[in-house]
Amino acid sequence: MLDIQLLRKDIDGVAKRLADRGYILDVAAFSALEAERRAIQTRTEELQAKRNSLSKQIGAMKGRGEDTSAVMAEVGGIGDEMKASAVQLEDIQKRLSDLLLGVPNLAHESVPVGNDEAGNVEVRRWGTPRQFDFEIKDHVDVGTPLGLDFETGAKLSGARFTLLRGQIARLHRALAQFMIDTHTQQHGYTEVYTPYIVNPEILFGTGQLPKFADDMFRVEKGGGENTVTQYLISTSEISLTNTVRDSIVDSNELPIKLTAHSPCFRSEAGSYGRDTRGMIRQHQFDKVEMVQIVSPDTSYDALEQMVAHAEVILQKLELPYRVITLCTGDMGFSAAKTYDLEVWVPAQNTYREISSCSNTEAFQARRMQARFRNAQGKPELVHTLNGSGLAVGRTLVAVLENFQNADGSVTVPAALRPYLGGVDRLEVKASA
């Protein structure tokens, strides 16, 4: 959530910066609510001053033995009016809050201005895409003989679900373990096992609600008036970041660096017809997430560090990739700045997103009321960052395609072999 003081001080400037993100702020609605709020607050202050004055007058009158009933009745009337004003003010504050809940974060000044992904800027590349001397297969054709089972996944759960069997399932698990081990042993993150089902207010904290309810899977328990609504997490960023919700941490605890391996559940409501083949876009997929909770003066250094941590995974796996800075029109709702890492997918002859690392500055912290004590001992909002380290399913796709062999086997990247008991190749089992 944006700091409302920014809008009060420079509504036109904020509106312009939001327009760069493709969001049109309802300036008239905000200004009207603000005018109403100021009028009520001014009237309340006037009533308070008058009541204080009359209360002093009553004391003096009693000292002189005078009748105070008329003045006391007037004070009572003022009290009633103040109560009514308080109700009005609470309603206006809620309407202002509801308006702000739908407003995205402001982009950092270093973010390129653009309307969509065409405005993104490439930062660097690593690795050289392999030149194949045989016809490239996509991960579906490579993986199906090795244990990818789309047919059974669809039978069990419908479209965009996949069943993994045998050596493919083991490779998938190895990838996640390798990522977690790297982040905890080399990058200083603490591993966390989080709930996969969270309460609605948790999603308000990280920005998925109220704006993106259609992207979430909702679950209900109980029935009738006792129904309780909760949501499946779309990323463990949600649960990891909210661990500091409604709390004040000591500055010496920062940075807090957390990582988790979890399934993620997304309805893909806006992706109809996109990536319908294979594992690129699924309703359920695994991801290793990185979250950092830091002081404001270190958050952009932390963002660069987080990107480097995700890059280490790709480099250890020997997967070519590129890093891009997302433009204003392509960033996520909560982000102030985002880098995407895109891995080379040979069958598509292009790079595809495999990690997204974002600094949300104080946007999520304000919604969560997550603070730390600064050098002066005063509570101040933390900055929160999140990044994929990496999306496990898409990494599996990249390994299958980049390490495929002409005979249908897949060479196991050296970094993963210790997790597979030394196995260096996945091979198609001969039919009986």
Curated annotation (Swiss-Prot):
Metabolic or biological pathway, per its Swiss-Prot or TrEMBL entry: Aminoacyl-tRNA biosynthesis; selenocysteinyl-tRNA(Sec) biosynthesis; L-seryl-tRNA(Sec) from L-serine and tRNA(Sec): step 1/1
Catalytic reaction equation(s): tRNA(Ser) + L-serine + ATP = L-seryl-tRNA(Ser) + AMP + diphosphate + H(+); tRNA(Sec) + L-serine + ATP = L-seryl-tRNA(Sec) + AMP + diphosphate + H(+)
Record carries keyword Zinc: no
Residue positions binding ATP: R266, S267, E268, E353, I354, S355, S356
Recorded superkingdom: Bacteria
Entry annotated with the keyword Aminoacyl-tRNA synthetase: yes
Broad enzyme group: ligase
CDD domains: SerRS_core
A Pfam family: Seryl_tRNA_N
GO molecular function annotations of the record: ATP binding; serine-tRNA ligase activity
Gene3D superfamilies registered for this protein in UniProt: Bira Bifunctional Protein, Domain 2, Serine-tRNA synthetase, tRNA binding domain
One CC-aspect GO term: cytoplasm
Keywords: Aminoacyl-tRNA synthetase, ATP-binding, Cytoplasm, Ligase, Nucleotide-binding, Protein biosynthesis
Binding residues for L-serine: T235, S236, E237, E289, S388
Record text about domains: Consists of two distinct domains, a catalytic core and a N-terminal extension that is involved in tRNA binding.
Chain's role: Catalyzes the attachment of serine to tRNA(Ser). Is also able to aminoacylate tRNA(Sec) with serine, to form the misacylated tRNA L-seryl-tRNA(Sec), which will be further converted into selenocysteinyl-tRNA(Sec).
Similarity comment: family membership: Belongs to the class-II aminoacyl-tRNA synthetase family. Type-1 seryl-tRNA synthetase subfamily.
Quaternary structure and partners: Homodimer. The tRNA molecule binds across the dimer.
Protein name in the entry: Serine--tRNA ligase
Native source organism of the sequence: Paraburkholderia phymatum (strain DSM 17167 / CIP 108236 / LMG 21445 / STM815)
